Amino acid sequence: MNKILVPTGYMGSGSSAVTDILAEIDGCSARDGDFEFVFLHCPNGVFDLEDKLLHGNNAIRSDEALHSFLGTMKQLCTKKYWWVGHYNEHVGPGFYDLCLRFVDELTFSRPNYYWYWQENTNARMFVELCIRKIVWLLTLKKVQLRKPRTYYDTMLSIPTEEEFYSAASRFISGVMDEIGLQEHNIVLDQLLLPHNLFRVDNYFGDELRVFEVSRDPRDVFIQNKYVWRSRNNAVVFPTDAEEFAQFYRRLRGSERPSGSAKVLKLQFEDLIYNYDASMEQIYAFLGVTKAQHSAPRTHFDPAKSIQNTQLSRANEQYAREAEIIAPYTEQYKSQYTDGVKRTIDFRSAPNVTNDCYFFRFAEKDGSKTVIIV
């Protein structure tokens, strides 16, 4: 059976290290690199649809849920310049047809009425309302055009849990086949997020393998503040140390544990300081042998990655901020406190260019440059 392999974690927590390790194992490389597949957990994605249809649903709420789902899925297919989109390329041309089939399977009635959500006036509707009024006046109130709406087809869906999960599982299976699961293993970065993992047994069979990677929150903070923000990338965490600490504790505390055998929890630091034992865990989880790890340390090299740990040791500023964070996040801290000869001071790393989980140093024009690979 081919596998769906999903590296996931918290921004800057090291899940790309797993993607790199998988690339070293026969038959496990990622066709789409670090492209993030979001159709399950994005706003108005499959999981939002689940929550709307199975919790607090009613006759008109389901109509909004189905239309919002289809609208977002269509944007993922067709919207230009949206980096999470382009599903016609990353998934396949049949993706939106699968979405339509999924919604059709969930819809039990298409009544001939409308509700206030469909009357939320936009620019197109305003023009149509003006035309409607003019026609009504010119015909001496004899001709009344159809009242404009945001959309005209009302869809009702009040599924049981079994009906919803069965339809959703068929939909996801179709998407996976569109990507190529029938031919080979597929690696889908961030298909699931840590906060969604309690749901996986409702949607997937034994073909799923999720690698949930966490990391010392002090290093997550330093990486986000001094790498991502310096590159003008969106940073999802606060960059004030105390605010980050409270945010991170609440974020992790809000997670519902999954307990699924389809999920392997990994600590980024273990992949480095306890490499051999971590690899044995990964082999067992994947059902592969060590011999199938045919190119070890060619994509992920713990000897290099160690420089990307214990970052608070790089300078006094990092150390002060890490000291503020530590009391709030004791249960998430790394157990490793030594073994690092040199860590990265991101303030003096001028050419930070890509998602970084390990580093190499290169000489360029006689000066030392940090290159992130």
Roles of regions detected by a PLM:
Residues 47-51, 72-76, 227-234, 250-260, ...:
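Noncatalytic linker/hinge segments flanking ATPase motor cores
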Residues 41-47, 223-226, 277-279, 307-309:
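Short aromatic-enriched loop/helix-cap "lid" or pocket-rim segments at secondary-structure transitions
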Residues 1-5, 114, 135, 252-262, ...:
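PAPS-dependent sulfotransferases, especially Golgi type II membrane carbohydrate sulfotransferases
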Residues 32-35, 214, 293-299:
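A generic structural motif
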Residues 50-61, 231-241, 312-320:
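A polyampholytic, Gly/Pro-enriched intrinsically disordered region
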Residues 108-293, 362, 366-372:
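PAPS-dependent sulfotransferase catalytic domain
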Residues 1-162, 302:
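PAPS-dependent sulfotransferase catalytic core
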Residues 60, 80, 106-113, 141, ...:
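Short secondary-structure junctions and interdomain/linker hinges
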